């Protein structure tokens, strides 16, 4: 299948072979896409580089989405590597694990703000920078999860994903006028590719 032949895109947030974003990466590669990947820190670098190589990619970038300058540099590096890209898959999320269980009332200000920055606002900054190097007709995808119900052991992430879904609507409005699609995919935890 060559539906994506000649298309180039960035995958952000692959954690391991069991992650949804890894399944997405495999499907894109199988369809002919050329992929680049991001990682954060040495532990993820050791996992992401071998995974990228399995899909014939040697293009990996370090990117801490908590740092605006790293997002800017990421897309400058992509421009240097490829010129333009066709798509971005944003699968970046974070919360302090100790605050996912128990009562939402116990969410700390620090974890709320950090979780919202990484899990939600980073997509806005990624979209802003990606749009500078994205071809008309390009696509941006972020991953979300059931945000209409209070899910046990999800706490602050529920709020982050609700905010992310709202952000997608506004980004779709802004970037749609420039020929770029923006969507969120809400896959169940048991999704398989």
Show the residue positions of the predicted features.
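Conserved hydrophobic beta-strands of the Rossmann-like cofactor-binding core
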Residues: 8-10, 88-93
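Conserved Rossmann-fold cofactor-binding substructure of NAD(P)-dependent oxidoreductases
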Residues: 66-81
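Rossmann-fold cofactor-recognition segment
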Residues: 52-69
């Amino acid at each position: 299948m060559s539906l994506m032949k000649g298309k180039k895109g960035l995958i952000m947030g692959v954690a391991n072979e069991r992650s949804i974003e890894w399944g997405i990466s495999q499907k894109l590669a199988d369809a002919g896409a050329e992929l680049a990947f991001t990682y954060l820190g040495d532990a993820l670098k050791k996992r992401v580089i071998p995974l990228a190589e399995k899909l014939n990619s040697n293009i990996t970038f370090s990117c801490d989405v908590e740092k605006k300058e790293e997002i800017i540099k990421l897309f400058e590096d992509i421009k240097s590597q490829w010129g333009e890209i066709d798509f971005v898959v944003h699968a970046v999320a974070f919360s302090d694990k100790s605050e996912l269980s128990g009562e939402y009332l116990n969410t700390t200000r620090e974890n709320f703000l950090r979780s919202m920055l990484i899990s939600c606002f980073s997509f806005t900054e990624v979209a802003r920078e990606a749009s500078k190097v994205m071809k008309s007709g390009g696509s941006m995808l972020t991953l979300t999860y059931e945000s209409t119900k209070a899910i046990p052991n999800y706490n602050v992430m529920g709020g982050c994903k609700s905010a992310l879904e709202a952000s997608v609507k506004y980004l779709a409005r802004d970037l749609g006028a420039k020929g770029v699609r923006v969507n969120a995919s809400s896959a169940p935890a048991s999704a398989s590719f």
